[in-house]
Each structure stands twice: as structure tokens, then as C-alpha cells.
Amino acid sequence: MKSSINFLPAEKRRDLHQLVEIIRNEIKDCVMIILYGSYARDMYVDCDRRRDYGVTTFFMSDYDILIVTRRRLGLKEYDVYARITERFFENKQSEFYTRPQFINESISRLNKNLELGQYFYHEIKKQGIMLYSSREFKLARCRKLNYAEIAQIARDYFSEKFQFASDFLLG
């Protein structure tokens, strides 16, 4: 996993350093903070303003951040995210400012998913940038899956999501 954000503009590096500081202050159980997604791949969109069919639209990439803790945050997760975001936006003037998006995972569940070859976590490990590590834990090795395992993961994912969709449609 990469550890440098030096390829990003100074303003983005400042934002990420500030987010790391805020996260570490808000979440004492934090063992790793990982940037993933478009900013980690250096394929982000800073601000794309378009006018299509008479409507002005804006698109901006967000900071995708995986917060790894000893135990999942559980029910307080969204309250913590709201506090972090609120503190991050203090003294920021522009309405078009890069927003952080968070997910939380326990180190044990993250490592289990890496060992199982779960694609989402594999991609985070492959393309992500370690912004902070307590050095208490190491990430597990990603395992290559055979076709049967890939097919089973796809079936399980479909079953879970299809059930949610069915429940939603049926009320």
C-alpha cells in the first residue's frame, strides 16, 4: 500500500492532514486511516461545472476514507462522522469544497475480508494510501480466488441485495 500523498496539490494534502488529525481526536480506537477511491488513484475531479439542457450541474470527487478501528463504531458511527465533518468544514469559505465520505471497519473484519479475497477491500489495499497507522496491526495478504469462490461471492451478494430491493418494493 502506498503512503505518500505528495502527488496531490498542497490544498488537498492540507485537507487530508487535517482530516487525519480530527479523526484521531474523535476516534481514540483508530488504528489506521486509509484514503481510497479517485483521490488515491489520482483520478479525482476537483469541480466540474456543466450546463446541460439549460440546467447547470456540478460534480466533485469526495475524499473516500476508510477508518479502521479495533472494534466497529456501531450505532454511534454516524454521529461521529457528523462531528468529524462539522469540524472539518469549520472556517471553510467555499460552498464547493471537497467533502469527506467515511466507512468504518474493524481490523479483524478488514483482515478477514482481505483473506477471503473480497474485491472491494482488495482494491483498497492495492490502490489505497495509508494516511495513518498506529503500527499495532498489519493488513492481511490478499488471496486470489478461484472461479467457484468468485461465483459464490456474486451469488451471495445478489441474494442479499435482491432481498433488500424486494422488501423495498413490497413495502
Residue ranges and their predicted role:
Residues 1-34, 39-59, 69-171:
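Catalytic core of pol beta-like nucleotidyltransferases
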Residues 66:
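Short aromatic/hydrophobic contact patches that present stacked aromatics
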